[in-house]
Amino acid sequence: MSSGGLLLLLGLLTLWAELTPISGHDRPTFCNLAPESGRCRGHLRRIYYNLESNKCKVFFYGGCGGNANNFETRDECRQTCGGK
């Protein structure tokens, strides 16, 4: 196979991996956790994955502690946990 063909194949595989939705079996287990504001008193707007609605939603984070179901952007949440 030529180098151009290999690059095309690599590009198609990368595109497929980016566009394939995350299934429940592939989703990290922390995506199932409820949002936790943590023990500090900040008021930071963050995003968490909501398993019941299959959506990334807003919550307010205190700034420390909490759990890993805590993202700065919806895109980061969607890429990690799936959802809308």
UniProtKB/Swiss-Prot annotation:
Cysteine disulfide partners in this protein: C31-C81, C40-C64, C56-C77
SMART domains: KU
InterPro entries according to UniProt: Kunitz_BPTI, Kunitz_BPTI_sf, Prtase_inh_Kunz-CS, TFPI/VKTCI-like
Tissue distribution: Expressed by the venom gland.
Domain of life: Eukaryota
Main location, first listed in the record: secreted
Keyword presence, Disulfide bond: yes
Keyword rRNA processing: no
Phylogenetic placement of the source organism: Eukaryota, Metazoa, Chordata, Craniata, Vertebrata
Molecular function in Gene Ontology: serine-type endopeptidase inhibitor activity
Purpose of the protein: Serine protease inhibitor that inhibits trypsin.
Native source species: Daboia siamensis
Sites annotated Reactive bond for trypsin: R41, G42
First and last residue of the signal peptide: 1-24
GO CC annotation terms, alphabetical: extracellular space
Stated name of the protein: Kunitz-type serine protease inhibitor 7
Residues covered by the BPTI/Kunitz inhibitor domain: 31-81
PROSITE patterns: BPTI_KUNITZ_1, BPTI_KUNITZ_2
